[in-house]
């Protein structure tokens, strides 16, 4: 395949399908490795790579980075994750021939292009219409009518020219005008353009007379305030989704909220007093697994959850947990109104401030609730010993998938390790012995890697650099700011206190880096709605204590459930 150095012949590529809806694209993808490139109507015409990988259809938006116009270099670069390319064909060629994954999160590899078999020009009526006024079809040349005169700008240009199709960069003298169109702006045309236009018109004599031109203008220039500037710096621009009515909105958008870039802060934004109650965890969200009223530990729901977790490998579950933790912490998906209400740009900064008290309590409850649910996954196995050992192995593998260098979700890792180190679980000698006998690698990883790592994180000495970590360990700092005393001898507790405060300061400083790393981890990831809900704080709270008990005081709820876990542990392995 010829690799062009610019994006002018994208429409000529066999794998480019023009404007194509998500559903029709998925219908064309039959086998693993099949892929095509399409223009997404819901993403403002931006190119999207659709592929099938491991039985699932995945969609990756190609981001455009505008460059300052200079002779001899492209006007834009295109990228999926980190590496940038001068054109979309060059990007596709690199990923296809090199067998490189489109994203590290999914590992999807494209190998077989799905060729477009239809005519070159496709109309909007064939696929999904864009929301809003009619627009020029992206990345396809406009089909000019017979009544429009030939021009060098159109005769010499190939059938696809993104730069030429934009009104902001198209010369006004090159715009076609019928006899009834009003003159928008008179500008002297270069001599070469006039001469070439005269030569081009010699070959444009039609056999029949052209149709009568319309009485209304065929093309209108937008106001100067609406046109984007032709001068631009090297700034990634992610177009925003056009607003749609509720009846037209799609339940699964092309670009989820965790992939959208944060809005730029206004320079002269007026100061607003931060609100005392900031929450990123919706408490009244509708549930697809629980009814409006439910009792604690419903057997049918527990059976459904068991099958749900068995269907997903630990790496996928870790990404689901990272997504929910980033939302609960306020690292991703924070709106401009929320930033204005809390006075800072992310929840990591809010945790260190006095008015972050409510968020700190929410994260403490989330940590303890997930730890109790993990312990229940082991203690609720009333079958043979091997079943409980398999549950332990599943938690250990999930912890390994959450550790730094993998998903990098340290709050999720702390919750899973809290379940494994809970006294009601750690006392099960026969179960742990069976784990060492049947799943030796998991047992060694728990003893030699996970336990020392968790000890270092709790003492403020573990890894916390962005890149290795997507979401830092906030529990020690949250407990400290909520007034909990640091355990241990006085000299050791003072050193631990200083390390915790030092780590909190670095966490706030590196909050934008953590946000970028988390977004890269989740780019291209499409979660299972049920598994994602099963990892939210509100769902786990209702699962453990029921719809009525979920509103009881936190200390009372945890004390009662600890006793329930103690009874289950004694039933499995009574004291000698």
UniProtKB/Swiss-Prot annotation:
Record note on modification: Phosphorylated on tyrosine.
Keyword Acyltransferase belongs to the record: no
GO biological process terms on file: JNK cascade; small GTPase-mediated signal transduction
Organism superkingdom: Eukaryota
Domain SH2: 15-114
Keywords noted in UniProt: Phosphoprotein, SH2 domain
Sequence positions bearing Phosphoserine: 123, 125, 147, 180, 201
Free-text tissue specificity from the UniProt record: Weakly expressed in placenta, fetal kidney, fetal lung, adult pancreas, adult kidney and adult lung.
Keyword Metal-binding: no
Annotated region (Disordered), positions in chain: 145-165, 204-227
InterPro entries with a match to the protein in the record: Ras_GEF_dom_sf, RASGEF_cat_dom, RASGEF_cat_dom_sf, SH2, SH2-Ras-GEF_adapter, SH2_dom_sf, SH2_SHEP1/BCAR3/NSP1
Subunit structure: Interacts with BCAR1.
PANTHER family (UniProt xref): BREAST CANCER ANTI-ESTROGEN RESISTANCE PROTEIN 3 HOMOLOG-LIKE PROTEIN (PTHR14247), SH2 DOMAIN-CONTAINING PROTEIN 3A (PTHR14247:SF11)
Protein name: SH2 domain-containing protein 3A
Organism: Homo sapiens
């Amino acid at each position: 395949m010829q690799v062009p150095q610019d994006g002018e012949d994208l429409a000529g590529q066999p794998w480019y399908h023009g404007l194509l809806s998500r559903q029709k694209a998925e219908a064309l993808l039959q086998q693993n490795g099949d892929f095509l490139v399409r223009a997404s109507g819901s993403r403002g015409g931006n190119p999207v790579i659709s592929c099938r990988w491991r039985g699932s259809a995945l969609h990756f938006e190609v981001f455009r980075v505008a460059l300052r116009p200079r002779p001899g270099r492209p006007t834009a670069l295109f990228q999926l994750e980190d590496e940038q390319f001068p054109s979309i064909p060059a990007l596709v060629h690199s990923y296809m021939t090199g067998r490189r994954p489109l994203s590290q999160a999914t590992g999807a590899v494209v190998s077989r292009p799905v060729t477009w078999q239809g005519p070159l020009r496709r109309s909007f009526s064939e696929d999904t219409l864009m929301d809003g006024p009619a627009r020029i079809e992206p990345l396809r040349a406009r089909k000019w009518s017979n009544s429009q005169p030939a021009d060098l700008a159109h005769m010499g240009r190939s059938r696809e020219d993104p730069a030429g199709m934009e009104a902001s960069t198209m010369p006004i003298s090159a715009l076609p005008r019928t006899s009834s169109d009003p003159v928008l702006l008179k500008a002297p045309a270069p001599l070469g353009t006039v001469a070439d236009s005269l030569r081009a018109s010699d070959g444009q004599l039609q056999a029949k007379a052209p149709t009568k031109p319309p009485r209304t203008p065929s093309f209108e220039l937008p106001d100067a305030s609406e046109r984007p500037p032709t001068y631009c710096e090297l700034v990634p621009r992610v177009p925003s989704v056009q607003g749609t009515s509720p009846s037209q909105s799609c339940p699964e958008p092309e670009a989820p909220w965790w992939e959208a870039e944060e809005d730029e802060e206004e320079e002269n934004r007026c100061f607003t007093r931060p609100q005392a109650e900031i929450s990123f965890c919706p408490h009244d969200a509708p549930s697809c697994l629980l009814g409006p009223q439910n009792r604690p530990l419903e057997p049918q729901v527990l059976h459904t959850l068991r099958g749900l977790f068995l269907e997903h490998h630990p790496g996928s579950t870790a990404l689901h947990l990272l997504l929910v933790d980033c939302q609960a912490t306020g690292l991703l998906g924070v709106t401009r109104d929320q930033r204005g209400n809390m006075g800072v740009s992310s929840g990591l900064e809010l945790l260190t401030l006095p008015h972050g008290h409510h968020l700190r309590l929410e994260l403490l409850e989330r940590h303890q609730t997930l730890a109790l649910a993990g312990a229940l996954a082991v203690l609720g196995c009333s079958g043979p010993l091997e079943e409980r050992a398999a549950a332990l192995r599943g938690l250990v593998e999930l912890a390994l998938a959450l550790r730094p260098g993998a998903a990098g979700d340290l709050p999720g890792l702390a919750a899973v390790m809290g379940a494994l180190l809970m006294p009601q679980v750690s006392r099960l000698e026969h179960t742990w012995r069976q784990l060492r006998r049947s799943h030796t690698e998991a047992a060694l990883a728990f003893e030699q890697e996970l336990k020392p790592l968790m000890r270092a994180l709790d003492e403020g000495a573990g890894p916390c650099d962005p890149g290795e970590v997507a979401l830092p360990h906030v529990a020690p700092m949250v407990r400290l700011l909520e007034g909990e005393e640091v355990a241990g001898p006085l000299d050791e507790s003072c050193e631990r206190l200083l390390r915790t405060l030092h780590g909190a300061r670095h966490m706030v400083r590196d909050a934008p880096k953590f946000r970028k790393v988390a977004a890269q981890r989740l780019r291209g990831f499409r979660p299972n709605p049920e598994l994602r809900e099963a990892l939210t704080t509100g769902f786990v709270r209702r699962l453990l204590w029921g719809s009525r008990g979920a509103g009881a005081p936190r200390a009372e709820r945890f004390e009662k459930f600890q006793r329930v876990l103690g009874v289950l542990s004694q039933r499995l392995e009574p004291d000698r």
